[in-house]
UniProtKB/Swiss-Prot annotation:
Pfam families: Cg6151-P. Channel activity is inhibited by La(3+), which reduces Ca(2+) influx and thus inhibits it's function in promoting activity-dependent bulk endocytosis (ADBE) in response to high stimuli. It is a multi-pass membrane protein. The keyword Cell membrane applies. It is found in: Cell membrane; Cytoplasmic vesicle, Secretory vesicle, Synaptic vesicle membrane; Presynaptic cell membrane; Endosome. SMART domains: Cg6151-P. This is Calcium channel flower. The gene is flower. Keywords: Calcium, Calcium channel, Calcium transport, Cell membrane, Cell projection, Cytoplasmic vesicle, Endocytosis, Endosome, Ion channel, Ion transport, Membrane, Synapse, Transmembrane, Transmembrane helix, Transport. Belongs to the calcium channel flower family. The record marks E79 as: Calcium ion selectivity. The chain crosses the membrane at residues 35-55, 66-88, 107-127.
Length: 194
């Protein structure tokens, strides 16, 4: 058994479909899940640190810490539902989110990560919520998909526009056919030089 198969076996849930699809490499699929688990752990830890800032009478940091801890629990619930065995509906919620497109998860993670940073800008909120934000960015990049092959990009670049005329590739090609190039030789006659 290879190292990749061991990692995929550890991170796969029972009866789990492949929601991301075969086009994503294994290290991106499971790396994003690992990043989400680590981000959730640190968000909960640093959210607790922000909650202790009530000692300095900073209510906004208290609220930011609570939001950050809730965001950490939500990310942990979605990325590793095995951590919440005592709740019966966790797998249902995780499967429902897994069935949605990846940009939904990316938007959810990014939206949950921004408020604690705005409310209490500091290293604890920046690092804890920043990891959740990074997980959302990784899922967003996965939602965009892979770049096309070189042959596909060349074929798309050589397609004709308007039927018979090939695409123009010189420097003077513009949107308007009769457009004149800019002249940088002198000032315009109506310029007041002010």
């Amino acid at each position: 058994m290879s190292f990749a198969e061991k990692i995929t076996g550890l991170l796969a849930r029972p009866n789990q479909q492949d929601p991301i699809g075969p086009e994503q490499p294994w290290y991106l699929k499971y790396g994003s899940r690992w990043l989400g688990i680590v981000a959730a752990f640190f968000a909960i830890l640093f959210g607790l640190w922000n909650v202790f800032s009530i000692i300095t009478l900073s209510v906004s940091c208290l609220v930011a810490g609570i939001i950050q801890m809730v965001a950490g629990f939500v990310v942990m619930l979605l990325e590793a539902p095995c951590c919440f065995v005592c709740f019966e509906q966790v797998n249902v919620i995780a499967d429902k989110v897994d069935s949605k497109p990846l940009y939904f998860r990316a938007g959810l993670y990014i939206a949950m990560a921004i408020p604690p940073i705005i409310l209490c800008f500091g290293l604890a909120s920046l690092f804890g919520s920043g990891l959740i934000f990074g997980t959302g960015v990784v899922y967003g990049m996965m939602a965009l998909g892979k770049k096309a092959s070189a042959e596909d990009m060349r074929a798309a670049a050589q397609q004709t526009f308007g039927g018979n005329t090939p695409a123009q590739t010189n420097d003077r090609a513009g949107i308007v056919n009769n457009a004149q190039p800019f002249s940088f030789t002198g000032a315009v006659g109506t310029d007041s030089n002010v």
